[in-house]
Curated annotation (Swiss-Prot):
GO terms for biological process: arginine biosynthetic process via ornithine; citrulline biosynthetic process; L-arginine biosynthetic process. It is found in: Cytoplasm. This is Ornithine carbamoyltransferase. Pfam families: OTCace, OTCace_N. It comes from Nitrosomonas europaea (strain ATCC 19718 / CIP 103999 / KCTC 2705 / NBRC 14298). Belongs to the aspartate/ornithine carbamoyltransferase superfamily. OTCase family.
Length: 307
């Protein structure tokens, strides 16, 4: 079977995602029914993390165990990567000892170089540029609650970060619209915006205008990992971009709210929104587990048929 990697959302087509979501539904149901499903017995996942993580690490580690395999966590601080070993050399060695790898790092170029030299599938557990596993779970969560996302409108409020970038790629795959509203100076990079065009992406100055008639409102922390030195400046710059009840009222009545977590109540979102009836953030977080189990199954076994 040809080795496939999952480094960006555009690495798979819509048909493949529909298959993954079908598998996710079945795998999640088996999990809820406490039925054992071990298709990855004797397979090993290596998780190489340069950045801190709660949900990504836990969902991959628990997911691999629940599929019958085992998982090994490697921090770059504890390996030779942290002492300057070339990424290419690390990929060649590690991929001879395990069956699949999740890499969470800063520069997206690092994971591309790693994948080019790996003998096994590599999954992007987050880079500064993309977070495809998060959007995989987000779209599945939307489908659970509202059906197909095709033709819908997603409003992204806040920093145009890696999650925002991935939403833009997903809009191309699933044919939905993304409204982005950021403070001046934090807009989607012009060269990146040019990749998507106005059919699926539109930039708004006012967050309330961006949210108008949206089916899904989503945001993230104002200060992503690696930008801690800018925290005070960002709090001032993003002060008008907090998702509150007034902003949610501009969206459709049945609109959902998502946040990839961790959240800072009173900053990017008010407590009454994230803890309110429109919020599906806890389903969203749980679905990281189920979608990534389907992803690992697909990368290691290919299509096995929907049960």
């Amino acid at each position: 079977m040809q080795i496939r990697h999952f480094l960006q959302f555009k690495d798979f087509d819509r048909q493949e995602y529909e298959y993954l979501f079908d598998r996710t539904r079945w795998i999640k149901n088996e999990f809820k029914q406490y039925r054992r499903y071990w298709p990855l017995t004797d397979r090993t996942l290596a998780m190489i993390f340069e950045k801190h993580s709660t949900r990504t690490r836990l969902s991959f580690e628990a997911g691999m165990h629940q599929l019958g395999g085992s998982a090994i966590y490697l921090s770059t601080r504890d390996t030779q990567l942290g002492r300057g070993e070339p990424v290419e050399d690390a990929a060649r060695v590690i991929s001879r000892m395990v069956d699949i790898i999740t890499l969470r790092t800063h520069e997206h170029g690092v994971i591309e170089r790693f994948a080019e030299n790996s003998r096994v599938p590599v999954i992007n557990g987050l880079t500064d540029e993309y977070h495809p596993c998060q959007i995989l779970a987000d779209i599945f969560t939307f489908m659970e609650h509202r059906g197909s996302i095709a033709g819908k409108t997603v409003a992204w409020i806040g920093d145009s970060n890696n999650v925002c970038n991935t939403w833009l790629q997903a809009a191309e795959v699933f044919d939905f619209n993304v409204h982005v509203s950021t403070p001046p100076g934090y807009e989607v990079e012009p060269e990146r915006a040019g990749l998507y065009g106005t059919d699926h992406y539109e930039q708004f100055v006012s967050p309330h205008d961006a949210v108008k008639d949206a089916d899904l409102v989503t945001t993230d922390v104002w200060t992503s990992m690696g930008f801690e030195d800018e925290a005070d400046t960002r709090k001032n710059d993003f002060a008008d971009f907090r998702v509150d009840a007034e902003m949610m009222a501009c969206a459709k009545e049945e609109a959902l709210f998502m946040h990839c977590l961790p959240a800072h109540r009173g900053e990017e979102v008010d407590a009454e929104v994230i803890d309110g009836p429109q919020s599906v953030v806890w389903d969203e977080a749980e679905n990281r587990l189920h979608t990534q189990k389907a992803l690992m199954e697909y990368l290691l076994l290919g299509r096995i048929g929907v049960r």
